[in-house]
Amino acid sequence: MKYIIIGGVAGGATAAARLRRVDEKSDILLFEKGKYISYANCGLPYYIGGVIAEREKLLVQTPTFFGQRFRVDVRVENEVIAIHPKDKTITVRTADGREYEETYDKLLLSPGATPVRPPLEGIDSEGIFTLRNVEDTDHIKSYLTENSVKRSVVVGAGFIGLEMAENLHHAGVAVSVVEMGNQVMAPIDFSMAAPVHQHLIQKGVSLYLEEGVTHFQRTEQGITVFLKSGKTIPADMVLLSIGVRPATALAKQAGLKIGEAGGIWVNEYLETSAKDIYAVGDAIEYPHPLTGEPWLNYLANPANRQGRIVADNMVFGNKVAYEGAIGTSIAKVFDMTVASTGLAAKRLKQWEMEYQSSVTHSSSHAGYYPDALPLTLKLTFHPVTGKLYGAQGIGYEGVDKRIDQIAGLIKRGGTVYDLMETEHTYAPPFSSAKDPIAIAGYVASNIISGAMPVVTWRELVQHKNEVMLIDTRTAEEFSFGTIPGAINIPLDDLRERMLEVPTDKPIVLFCAVGLRGYLAQRILMGNGYKNVRNLSGGYKLYSAAVAPVPVPSIAAASVDARVTFGSTETSGTVVQSDSILSAGGSSKEPLKINACGLQCPGPIMQVKKAMDTLEPGEQVEIVATDAGFARDASAWCDTTGNRLVGSHEDKGRYTVVIEKGNSNMVCPSSTGTVAAGRGKTLILFSDDLDKALATFVLANGAAATGQKVTIFFTFWGLNVIKKLHKPETEKDIFGKMFGMMLPSSSKKLKLSKMSMGGIGGKMMRYIMNKKGIDSLESLRQQALENGVEFIACQMSMDVM
């Protein structure tokens, strides 16, 4: 028997080795038009960036060694230019142009895929590259070295594009990424890509989304990249990572069937439409196990599995069926890990498949064990049966093992209930007693059962004006930022403030990550509320999804863009610069606090406690893993008169340095925040509803800027703070008369104008509730939580 294999690397080389292991006597010929038959193509970007220092480590097997070990006739720089299925022959062209023919009994096609290179003006200019093989790698590496490249543009934000962006950055080159879509990494959903956008920008990458390249121009100064918006980006080098397409030219020449998706058609045994000709790898298409539709899957793992299967079928006959691939992939994007498996929500929409999704925020391991890092999982599943369709994960540690575990369940037709029953190894350094995938299963099962109806961030954006939006976080968290239109009823206050929640309007609850929103939802549903939904993924997901991507400036596209807020980045290590430590009025070392593993508002509460122990001018340095901490710290400084000295992120850890202000220091913020130490006193002597509302709005606004606020209630103003359920007290005849004539509580206050016997006040409250405006009672509670001091006039109380 004589086997011929066209193409090496994952599919072809794997098949050749397996063929020899199961058939010692047959002839095996391996043809490769390049110089290399087996190399780590997924490691190429890391060699360019210097992470992999030795080029030889990329070469898994040299042609000579492979040929000797497996007794395979390896012919590199021999390109097969034609296949003749009827004659069972191939035509080969050598590097020097000579052509010859070889016969075969069975043939395997493993030609791979070719990079997309659109016919744009200037695309063939010097300094514009694609990355697909070792030869491409050598060209890019030498160009970087010989031309002292300082600026680069990566066109395309897929896996290879972002890996190249990271490695060029690692090599000291400033990077701009241009992507035609509205997100990076097309296999994942937009909401999961949004945190990746933020991470790239934090690392100094200039990100151009929804931008296309129109043409390139080479000048003496370098390459100018022209965008469809009219913007231009100067560069010394351009890397095209627009995508790949199946290499089907040889198959078409041979008359083989090309499938609907554009790849070589194969049956379940990986045999093409021509007898005794098989195909594997990036060039083939195959039905997706979940949709049944043909698709192209450009991943190394399926190609290796196909290589083993096809070798057995070529030797023993068509007995081993290929079950297909669901598309399980992972990428390192600077410090972040991004992984996915199965079908994302947007793919399910594309195939018009009914689905539901869940988003959960967990930690890489037990939160109380040091250095627990955030880990977010998104599941897609059937809304009735719970059958798993897909999963996506982003985080810094432990993402891979969770997605791998879920992928195995999907391949076996598993459901969200299987996630709940999955056993996992547990010790605090590695996981939690309830693993993130178990938590994801619990949440998904609650959605299916109706225990937790959810609304997605996108649905909320579309219908926000039709619902009452309640933020169940603490008042302090609420003050750092919330969804526009939301009112704040902290979870622990909900039972006492339930009268503020209308029964005739759709309610959407949310918190930071979803748990408190769910608990609030159960309280309301347990008290008869029907139309109550929890925001999937919480404010953390919503704020990331709706946050605009900053428009890059050309000036920002420099190596110095990596240095932010006085920190210096060197080979992935962040070193605190002297400028941060000496910028304040104190020479003392900052008080250091480790808040890693704490969720909001934990880190900011730690800051507040620390600041209470410091003198003006002294600093606190706090490290947290909550991704929103740096934003919250900035808002906290703006409202308290303290100074944000600097912040930076490294491997999922956010370090913030804050200097305590004093009465003589004004926070140098563009918001014009007044320094802490100044105070306001408001006197409320009216019990008119509108005047009381105005008083509390002013009080809360002043308190939010860090000022000490006091409200002095006198005469009729005392009615504003009357308790709804008052204790029994002894009163004389005049006290009882006042009690009957005056409002019994703040709920009974009237308007100063157009009261209409109390109807005006009720109308005002109805309109406020409908528009999601805080009630008087809500504003009063917020004032107490913000530290506003209430003083009741003793004389007035004695008289009344």
Where are the model-predicted features located?
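Mid-to-C-terminal Rossmann-like scaffold of FAD/NAD(P)H-dependent oxidoreductases
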Residues: M1, A283-E397, P428-S432, P436-Q462, ...
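FAD-site-proximal beta/loop scaffold in flavoenzymes
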Residues: D124-S148, E220, T224-F226, K231-D312, ...
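Rhodanese-like catalytic fold shared by cysteine-dependent sulfurtransferases
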Residues: Y417-P428, S432-R458, H463-M468, A475-V508, ...
